[in-house]
A protein has these predicted regions:
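The serine-hydrolase catalytic nucleophile loop
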Residues: 42-54, 69, 229-230
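Serine-hydrolase catalytic core
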Residues: 163-272, 276-280
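Short beta-strand element of the alpha/beta-hydrolase
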Residues: 31-40
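Primarily recognizes the serine-hydrolase "nucleophile elbow" in alpha/beta-hydrolase
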Residues: 102-159, 190-191
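Catalytic nucleophile-loop/oxyanion-hole region of alpha/beta-hydrolase
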Residues: 70-102
Length: 287
C-alpha cells in the first residue's frame, strides 16, 4: 500500500510574492509524471476539493502539487490574469527541481482559465496534458450573467472605464457573488476589466485553441450553477479543440442546482477515477 507524505511548500516569485502550496508524495518520492493543480476564484490550495483528491492521486503514484497563484482567495480582484497565470510556472519549476520529468497541469473553475493561458503563452514543454475541473467556457459571459444581464454588465464596464480614465483604476469596489449565497469579492476597477471585461482573455474556449496537440480533460457536475460553466460552455470547448474530452457527470438527486456541485462535493471519488482512467489511456503513467 502506498504511503502518502505531505509537505507544505512555498515558492517566491521574481517580484517577491510568496505562494504557498501542499505537495503530496507517494512513498515520500517524486514521480516521473507529476500533477500540478491551481484553485479558482476566491479559493486556496487547501480547498476541500483539492484536499480530498490530491492524496488519492498520490496513492495512485502521482506526486501532486496544489498551489496558490498570487490572486488566490480574497486577492482575486487585485492582480491581472497574466501575472497570476505566470505564477503557475513556479509550481512547475518546483516539481522539476524535485525530479519530475513531465507534468499534467490543471485547475479548478478559474484555474481552468489560468492553466491553458499559461500553456498558450509559454508552450512549456514540461506540460504534457491539461485538467479542467468545473471547466469554464467564457468568464466574460459568466460575468454578464453574474451582473444580472447585458444592461447591468454594460453599466459595470462603463463605470470601470470611467474610473480608469480618471486615473482611479486601482480603487476598490465589491463585485456581486457569482451565484446567490456565494461570497462577494472586492475588485479593482482595472482588474475587473482585465478579468471580466469585454476584451478580457479569460476565455478558455479561445485559450485551448493555442495549447498545441496536448490532450485535455474537462469535467462538470450538471448541478453546477456557476454561470461560466453553463451551456453553451461545453459546446464551445468541444468545438475549440478536438483533443478535449468532456465528461458531464451523471445527474443525482436532488436535480436542482446547488453551489457545492461546483466543488464536486461528495463526488470526489468519481473525479479521481475519471482522471486516472484518462491518464492511463494517454499512457501518462506515474513512472
Amino acid at each position: 500500500m502506498t504511503h502518502v507524505t505531505t509537505e507544505v511548500v512555498s515558492c517566491r516569485s521574481d517580484d517577491g510574492i510568496d505562494l504557498a502550496g501542499a505537495l503530496f508524495l507517494p512513498d515520500g518520492k517524486m514521480s516521473r509524471t507529476a500533477i500540478a493543480l491551481f484553485p479558482g476564484t476566491g479559493s486556496e490550495f487547501y480547498q476541500p476539493f483539492f484536499a480530498l483528491i490530491c492524496p488519492v492521486l498520490a496513492e495512485a503514484g502521482y506526486a501532486t502539487l496544489a498551489m496558490n497563484r498570487r490572486d488566490h482567495g480574497q486577492f482575486f480582484g487585485y492582480y491581472p490574469l497574466h501575472d497570476a497565470a505566470m505564477d503557475q510556472g513556479l509550481g512547475l519549476d518546483f516539481l522539476a527541481a524535485r525530479g519530475a520529468e513531465q507534468i499534467v497541469l490543471g485547475g479548478h473553475s478559474y484555474g481552468t482559465v489560468t492553466a491553458p493561458y499559461y500553456v498558450a503563452e509559454t508552450d512549456d514543454p514540461r506540460v504534457k496534458a491539461l485538467l479542467l475541473y468545473a471547466a469554464l467556457g467564457d468568464l466574460r459571459r459568466g460575468s454578464m450573467l453574474m451582473a444580472g444581464g447585458e444592461a447591468p454588465y454594460r453599466e459595470m464596464v462603463r463605470q470601470a472605464r470611467e474610473k480608469i480614465a480618471a486615473g482611479k483604476g486601482d480603487e476598490i469596489y465589491v463585485n456581486p457573488p457569482m451565484v446567490p449565497g456565494d461570497m462577494p469579492l472586492p475588485h479593482r476597477y482595472d482588474i475587473f476589466l482585465d478579468k471580466r471585461g469585454p476584451e478580457s482573455r479569460a476565455v478558455p474556449a479561445d485559450l485551448i485553441r493555442h495549447v498545441g496537440d496536448r490532450p485535455l480533460l474537462a469535467i462538470r457536475d450538471p448541478a453546477d450553477p456557476f454561470p461560466a460553466t453553463l451551456p453553451p460552455a461545453r459546446e464551445q470547448l468541444e468545438a475549440a479543440n478536438a483533443n478535449l474530452t468532456y465528461c458531464l457527470l451523471e445527474k443525482r438527486q436532488p436535480r436542482t442546482s446547488r453551489p457545492s456541485a461546483h466543488y464536486f462535493d461528495g463526488r470526489e471519488p468519481e473525479i479521481v477515477a475519471l482522471t486516472l482512467q484518462w491518464l492511463a489511456k494517454l499512457g501518462l503513467a506515474p513512472n
